[in-house]
A protein has these predicted regions:
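Core catalytic alpha/beta fold that binds nucleotide/phospho-ligands
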Residues: 1-115
Length: 115
């Protein structure tokens, strides 16, 4: 089992460039975040989830666009198990990945557990 965690200030994501958004977030992630008035809080929480995922994978150099954060119909977040994620899980002899996100007005945090 491996665990990663991250926390960031939401304010850092208020005025990010379009270049940054396209380099870090998938189209699905951007569509989700910008449904909300406080999109920057959701962007920050997804950033934290991506950072926590990288840390759980022992700081492997997984491009952020290869780590897609989504959610179930009832709002439970998850990491999409694409080919990159499945390959990294297999290399570690693990099979599943779970995340939990939280945010307030000031901070967002996420934890990732792979097992």
């Amino acid at each position: 089992m491996e665990i990663g965690i991250d926390i960031e200030q939401n304010e850092r994501f208020k005025d990010v460039s379009e270049h940054f958004l396209k380099r870090v977030y998938t189209k699905n992630e951007l569509a989700y975040a910008f449904k909300f008035k406080n999109a920057y809080e959701h962007l920050c929480a997804m950033w934290c989830a991506k950072e926590a995922t990288v840390k759980a994978f022992s700081n492997l150099k997984i491009p952020f666009l290869e780590i897609e954060i989504s959610s179930t119909a009832d709002g439970k977040p998850f990491v999409v198990k694409n080919d990159t994620i499945l390959s990294e899980l297999t290399k570690l002899g693990l099979s599943d990945i779970k995340i939990s996100l939280s945010h307030s007005k000031e901070y967002s945090t996420a934890i990732c557990m792979i097992y």
